[in-house]
């Protein structure tokens, strides 16, 4: 795998749109490497021809068009640091953000997800906190590197967790920063994000190129 710091430094020298495309290309190369070399990842991969809802051909739990627009939003808002809740099976969003920003701090409940990614960590670019995002210890750890320019909540999608994560982490974002929730369109028993959006009075805007996913965000005032 390519050394991350020199790659990040090269990407940071590019204009935003080119930087995003290079970072996404590296993400896709990484995904191909993962699928070709790691049987444990292959077991998690779902062919989109079989199940489009639960799959992604780039091994990233995002809709590409939505991710591109979100990355453009972050860079356009001078985002240098971000807190992400949820590393995911493949850590693909975390990986992209680590190439584009000065520092990313991600909270992940599942130690197995952390263990899969731990060999790729560059501590000058990224921090991963392992634990329940709603626990006092984890929140206090996140505060150690606050304030952030943005927060992206994409962890446990139950109503209770999304509401608590929003309440706990929005205050760690600077004024003028971005507070974002993933799966903003996904209505269902396990997905409480749309309900949280409806119940809060923030000036929500939405990045949506799919019926099932979507990213909702507001600018902190």
Question: How should each PLM-predicted stretch be described?
Answer:
Residues 1-152, 156-221:
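A short alpha-helical cap/connector motif
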């Amino acid at each position: 795998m390519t050394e991350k710091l020199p790659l990040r430094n090269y990407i940071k020298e590019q204009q935003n749109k080119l930087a995003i495309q290079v970072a996404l290309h590296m993400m896709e190369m990484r995904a191909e490497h993962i699928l070709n070399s790691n049987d444990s990842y292959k077991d998690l991969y779902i062919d989109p021809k079989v199940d489009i809802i639960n799959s992604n051909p780039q091994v990233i739990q995002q809709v590409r068009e939505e991710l591109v627009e979100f990355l453009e939003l972050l860079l356009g808002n001078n985002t240098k640091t971000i807190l992400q809740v949820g590393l995911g099976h493949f850590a693909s969003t975390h990986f992209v953000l680590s190439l584009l920003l000065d520092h990313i701090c991600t909270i992940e409940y599942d130690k197995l997800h952390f263990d899969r990614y731990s060999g790729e960590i560059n501590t000058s670019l990224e921090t991963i906190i392992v634990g329940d995002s709603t626990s006092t210890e984890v929140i206090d750890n996140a505060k150690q590197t606050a304030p952030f320019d943005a927060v992206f909540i994409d962890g446990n999608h139950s109503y209770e967790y999304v509401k608590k994560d929003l309440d706990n982490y929005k205050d760690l974002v600077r004024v003028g920063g971005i507070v974002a929730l993933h799966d903003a369109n996904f209505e269902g028993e396990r997905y409480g994000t749309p309900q949280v959006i409806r119940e809060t009075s923030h000036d929500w805007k939405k990045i949506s190129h799919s019926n099932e996913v979507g990213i909702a965000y507001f600018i902190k005032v």
